[in-house]
Amino acid sequence: MGEFKIQSKFKPTGDQPKAIDTLVQSIENGNRGQTLLGVTGSGKTFTMANIIERTQKPTLILAHNKTLAAQLCAEFKEFFPDNIVEYFVSYYDYYQPEAYVPQTDTFIEKDASINDEIDKLRHSATSALLERRDVIIVASVSCIYGLGNPEEYKKLTISLRPGMIKDRDEVIKKLIEIQYERNDIDFARGTFRVRGDNLDIIPSSSSSKGIRIEFFGDEIDRIREFDVLTGNIIGERQHVSITPASHFAASEETLEKSISIIEDELEDRLKVLTAEDKILEAQRLKQRTNYDIEMIREMGYCQGIENYSRILDGRMPGTPPQTLLDYFPEDFLMFIDESHVTLPQVRAMYAGDRSRKTSLVEFGFRLPCAFDNRPLKFSEFESKINQVVFVSATPGEYELDHSEIVAEQIIRPTGLLDPVIEIRPIKGQIDDLYGEIQRTVQRGFRVLITTLTKRMAEDLTKYLKDLNVKATYMHSDIDTLERMKIIRELRLGEVDVLIGINLLREGLDIPEVALVAILDADKEGFLRSETSLIQTIGRAARNSESKVIMYADNITKSMDKSIKETERRRVIQMEYNEEHNITPTTVIKGVRDIIEATKVSEEKENYESEVKKAAKKDIPIEKLIEQYEEEMKEAAKNLQFERAAELRDIIKDLKENSK
C-alpha cells in the first residue's frame, strides 16, 4: 500500500513548520476541528501537503469553485506524483434542472450537457477510494449531492484475475448489468467489444487505456492493458477491477425490489391527489412514473433515475443521501479551502433544491421520493466530517467556534510583506488611477481593479481601451474556461489591466500584479466588508513592489479593521525578515494552463509521460510524432478543435526538440 510522500525541492520555512506541527499534533490528539489562518502567499497549499504526509490519511479537499479546485489539483499532483490525486466536480457543462412554474403552467424538462472527461475523473476518484488509501480528492461543493450507494458500487465491481474459472458470456452479462454497452464499432469509455476469445473493455474511469481479457475455454488465460488509440499492449495485469459505468447502477435483485416500492409509493400518492381532486396531476404522475418503471425494468435505468435514489439505496424517507463523503474510509481528513466562502455555499445548497422540488411533487411531475435526491443539509454535512482543517486568510465565526486550535501562518517563505495601503479621495479617482496604471505597466507589472457593479467594470474597461490601455473585465457572466483564459493572458502580458467585481478575491495567484485598486472602498456592504477587503488586499501580496490604493472619502469600520490587520501582519513580517536577514522576493511561477484540470493539465501530463515512456522504450521521436498526428486528425474529424490544437502544439514542440 502506497504512502503519501512529497516530492519537492522546498522545505517548510517561515511560519510553516510551526503551523504544520501544531495542526498535526491537534489531528493526532483526535480533535475534530482546527483552523489554518494563513495569509495570501504564505504557502497554505504546501502546509496542507505536509499535514497529509505526516498524518497519512485519505484526504478530501473542498474548494468553492471548479477553477480553484483545478488549481489545487494541479499543485497537489506536483507534490504527490507517486500517489493518487483526483478531481471531482460537477460533470455538467450546461444544466437546466427540471422545474414547474404553476403561475404560467410551464414545465421545464431537465436539459443537461455532460462533460465526458469530468465524468471519467469522477469515476476515477471513486474507484481509487475503493482500491487505495493514499488518495487525495480535490472537490467542489457538488460532492455533497447524492452519488449512489458506495456499498452497492463496491458489490457490483467486477474483480478478475488470470486463472479464474469464468465463462466469457457470464462476464459479458455482468458488464451489461453494471451498465456497460457492447459496441464493436465506436469503442469508447463505458463500452466493451468481443473479438473471438478476447473481451476488450474501456473502464468508466479511463478513456485512453483499455483492458483485454483473453479466455481459454471457460478460464481467464491472460489480462492485458492496451492503448485504445494505437492498440499497442502496455503490459500484463495480475488483477483488474471493473467499476460500474454509472454511480447509480444496481443489481437485478435491487431493481426488482425498488420497482415494487416505487409502485407502492405511486399508489399512495395517487390516492392523495385524487382525494384533493387533482385529477390532471394524478394522471400525469401515473403516466410519467409508469414510463420510468418500464425503462428501469427493461434497461436497468431511466432518465432522471437519481430521483429514485433513496429507494434504490434502501433508505427511509428524509434520511441523508449517500455522497462522495461516504466513499471515504471513516478516518479520512478534510480540508475546507477558503472556508469563509465554501461553508456558506454548503449551507445554501439544500434550501434552493427543496423549493424547486416542491412544485414538481405538488403538481404530479415527481413522486415524493424525489425530495430525497438532494444535497446534504448543513447539519448532515457536519455529521459526516471525521476531522477537518478550515483554511482561510479570513476565517468566519463558525470556523473559529468549531476549532480546538487556530494556527497562524503570517510569514511568507519568500519574505514578501503585506502590501502598503494608500487611501485617496473618490473625486478624480479615474484620472488618478489612469496615471497609476501607466506607471505600473511601464515597470512591466499588471493591475487589478475592483468595482461595485458589472456596468461600471464594463464602462471602465471601454474608457481605458479608448486610452490604448490593454484592459479587460471579468464577471459572473463569463464562463470558467474564458475566465482562466483571461487570467492566463494577464499573466503573459497580453492584458495589462483586469477589472472585476468580487471575482478578484479568492484563489487568484498572479505574481505579476503590482497594483490593486479598490474603487468606492467606503461603500459599506458585502463587497466592501472586512473579509472582502482583506481578501482583495491579498491579491497584491505576491509581488515585492506591490501596493493597494483604496479610493474613499470616509474610513468605514471594515476599512479600518482591514487596514489595521494588514499593518499588524506587515509589522510581524518585517521583524521576522530583519531577524533572519531576508530580502523580500517576488514569487516566480510558470504560467500554467489550468483550464478545467480536465483538459490542458491532463494533456500536458499525458504528453510528458508519453515522451518519457518513448525515451525509455527507445521509440523514435518520428514515430511519436506520427501517432500524435493521427490523434490530431481524429480529434479534428470529431470537431474537438481544442484537443486538436493542443496536439498540434505538442507536435510542433517535438519537431523543434528533435532538430
UniProtKB/Swiss-Prot annotation:
<feature type="short sequence motif" description="Beta-hairpin">
    <location>
        <begin position="91"/>
        <end position="114"/>
    </location>
</feature>
<keyword id="KW-0234">DNA repair</keyword>
<dbReference type="GO" id="GO:0016887">
    <property type="term" value="F:ATP hydrolysis activity"/>
</dbReference>
<dbReference type="InterPro" id="IPR041471">
    <property type="entry name" value="UvrB_inter"/>
</dbReference>
<dbReference type="InterPro" id="IPR036876">
    <property type="entry name" value="UVR_dom_sf"/>
</dbReference>
<feature type="binding site">
    <location>
        <begin position="38"/>
        <end position="45"/>
    </location>
    <ligand>
        <name>ATP</name>
    </ligand>
</feature>
<dbReference type="InterPro" id="IPR006935">
    <property type="entry name" value="Helicase/UvrB_N"/>
</dbReference>
<dbReference type="GO" id="GO:0009432">
    <property type="term" value="P:SOS response"/>
</dbReference>
<dbReference type="GO" id="GO:0005737">
    <property type="term" value="C:cytoplasm"/>
</dbReference>
<dbReference type="InterPro" id="IPR024759">
    <property type="entry name" value="UvrB_YAD/RRR_dom"/>
</dbReference>
<dbReference type="InterPro" id="IPR001943">
    <property type="entry name" value="UVR_dom"/>
</dbReference>
<keyword id="KW-0347">Helicase</keyword>
<dbReference type="Pfam" id="PF02151">
    <property type="entry name" value="UVR"/>
</dbReference>
<keyword id="KW-0267">Excision nuclease</keyword>
<comment type="similarity">
    <text>Belongs to the UvrB family.</text>
</comment>
<comment type="subunit">
    <text>Forms a heterotetramer with UvrA during the search for lesions. Interacts with UvrC in an incision complex.</text>
</comment>
<dbReference type="InterPro" id="IPR004807">
    <property type="entry name" value="UvrB"/>
</dbReference>
<keyword id="KW-0227">DNA damage</keyword>
<dbReference type="GO" id="GO:0005524">
    <property type="term" value="F:ATP binding"/>
</dbReference>
<dbReference type="Pfam" id="PF04851">
    <property type="entry name" value="ResIII"/>
</dbReference>
<dbReference type="Pfam" id="PF00271">
    <property type="entry name" value="Helicase_C"/>
</dbReference>
<dbReference type="GO" id="GO:0009380">
    <property type="term" value="C:excinuclease repair complex"/>
</dbReference>
<dbReference type="GO" id="GO:0003677">
    <property type="term" value="F:DNA binding"/>
</dbReference>
<dbReference type="GO" id="GO:0009381">
    <property type="term" value="F:excinuclease ABC activity"/>
</dbReference>
<keyword id="KW-0742">SOS response</keyword>
<keyword id="KW-0378">Hydrolase</keyword>
<dbReference type="InterPro" id="IPR001650">
    <property type="entry name" value="Helicase_C-like"/>
</dbReference>
<keyword id="KW-0963">Cytoplasm</keyword>
<dbReference type="Pfam" id="PF12344">
    <property type="entry name" value="UvrB"/>
</dbReference>
<comment type="function">
    <text>The UvrABC repair system catalyzes the recognition and processing of DNA lesions. A damage recognition complex composed of 2 UvrA and 2 UvrB subunits scans DNA for abnormalities. Upon binding of the UvrA(2)B(2) complex to a putative damaged site, the DNA wraps around one UvrB monomer. DNA wrap is dependent on ATP binding by UvrB and probably causes local melting of the DNA helix, facilitating insertion of UvrB beta-hairpin between the DNA strands. Then UvrB probes one DNA strand for the presence of a lesion.</text>
</comment>
<dbReference type="Pfam" id="PF17757">
    <property type="entry name" value="UvrB_inter"/>
</dbReference>
<keyword id="KW-0067">ATP-binding</keyword>
<keyword id="KW-0547">Nucleotide-binding</keyword>
<dbReference type="GO" id="GO:0006289">
    <property type="term" value="P:nucleotide-excision repair"/>
</dbReference>
<dbReference type="GO" id="GO:0004386">
    <property type="term" value="F:helicase activity"/>
</dbReference>
<feature type="domain" description="Helicase C-terminal">
    <location>
        <begin position="429"/>
        <end position="582"/>
    </location>
</feature>
<keyword id="KW-0228">DNA excision</keyword>
<dbReference type="InterPro" id="IPR027417">
    <property type="entry name" value="P-loop_NTPase"/>
</dbReference>
<feature type="domain" description="UVR">
    <location>
        <begin position="622"/>
        <end position="657"/>
    </location>
</feature>
<feature type="domain" description="Helicase ATP-binding">
    <location>
        <begin position="25"/>
        <end position="182"/>
    </location>
</feature>
<dbReference type="InterPro" id="IPR014001">
    <property type="entry name" value="Helicase_ATP-bd"/>
</dbReference>
<protein>
    <recommendedName>
        <fullName>UvrABC system protein B</fullName>
    </recommendedName>
</protein>
